[in-house]
């Protein structure tokens, strides 16, 4: 493979991660000035250890060398999504109902593009977020990015 897209990379990475008994949370691929980075996030009910990341990294390195989806040199990182995890798919929000989230929209809605508040529901491809005393119903198709936004001060 000469070039890579997120979909192509996921087709290669997901089965390897899941075959090792982990949940594939998502991936990021960035290439800037010849410095490319493939970051893969894995999850497990019992949590993720450094050894887990090393094991997945070793296996992915072999698979990626064979499949060769990235034509240039790149660095591979495998990690847990962490407490302030990024959401990659709508279904991932469902797990965090009741938690603080930060959602950025593609275009402004009600005078704002960023909504930081408590995720109160997910239904029908829509996120319901309670922000500053108001409940907002945001269609997922409007969402550009989202993440858990822990309140470390509480």
Q: What are these language model-derived features?
A:
Residues 1-154:
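Short Lys/Arg-rich amphipathic alpha-helical segments
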């Amino acid at each position: 493979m000469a070039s890579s897209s997120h979909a192509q990379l996921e087709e290669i990475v997901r089965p390897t991660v899941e075959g090792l008994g982990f949940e594939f949370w998502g991936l990021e691929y960035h290439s800037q000035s010849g410095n490319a980075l493939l970051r893969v996030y894995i999850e497990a009910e019992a949590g993720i250890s450094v050894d887990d990341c090393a094991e997945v990294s070793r296996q992915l390195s072999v698979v990626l060398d064979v499949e060769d989806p990235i034509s240039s040199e790149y660095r591979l990182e495998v990690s847990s999504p962490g407490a302030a995890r990024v959401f990659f798919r709508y279904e991932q929000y469902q797990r965090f109902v009741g938690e603080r989230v930060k959602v950025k929209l593609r275009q402004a809605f009600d005078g704002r593009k960023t909504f930081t508040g408590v995720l109160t529901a997910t239904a029908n491809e829509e996120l319901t977020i309670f922000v500053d005393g108001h409940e907002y119903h945001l269609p997922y198709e409007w969402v550009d990015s989202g993440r858990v936004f822990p309140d470390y001060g509480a």
